[in-house]
Amino acid sequence: MRRTEYTIHCPASPPLTIGLVTDLHERNPAEVLNLLTYAKPDVIAVAGDTLERHKCGENLDKGDSSLASRLVCAGIQISEKLADLRQQKKRDVKAEYGLQFLREAVKIAPVVMCLGNHELYLTDEDRAVIAEAGVRLLDNTSVEIHGVLFGGIPSKQVTGTFHETFLETFSSSPQYKVLLCHHPEYYPYLSRYPIDLILSGHCHGGQIRVFGRGIFAPGQGLLPKYHHGVYDGRLVVSAGCANTASFPRWGNETEVVIVTLENEWPRLTLPATG
């Protein structure tokens, strides 16, 4: 697992460092926590799919109806099902890796979190444990931290639609605004709002990367447009911290992303003249 760093120059924002964690999928969080501890971010943004609260296959937003895309989706469904069968055991909500990660992360920095498609069946017990851990779950809500307004929206598979009232209220704030949204494929819609920065995951970097290009992402299909990196200076897409499918990544390392907000451009230092 690597640490990937991006710097966003934004005159309206106070200087701030954000640790972006996506797609943990209940895997062992030790490496993630080590990277965050070393980076010392001001805020940790957890942008979806931390927990596994779904039924295999039903949460795959296929993105397009082409035969190739449908075949890839079918392969992912089978792979996820096999992984679930191998790991099937009685769930203990208070002992899971995802919740362990949240409890430890709050010791490093304030934690804000949004829901992804794998959290479709988040329970009241889950919400209570998340709140007890000190994590702020942003479910069409927002919170101010260090002068920046953080908001979060869930997967449309959780709600069925966008919460227009929240998006309008959130985006109208004069503060610098950071939105947690698991799905980068929502960006064409969300970009119409004056939101300064959107943090996403979901694509797992395109799963297989060839010459830096992701091959497939749920919700976008083959050769996805938004799969990893920074787009338009407003959208950051993480490759995520883990896999759900049994087949491995290729050319696509897992990562924790560190986003630094700077309100000044670097100064150019000219050589002294005599």
Spans of features found by a protein language model:
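Conserved beta-sheet core of the metallophosphoesterase superfamily
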Residues: 184-260, 265-266
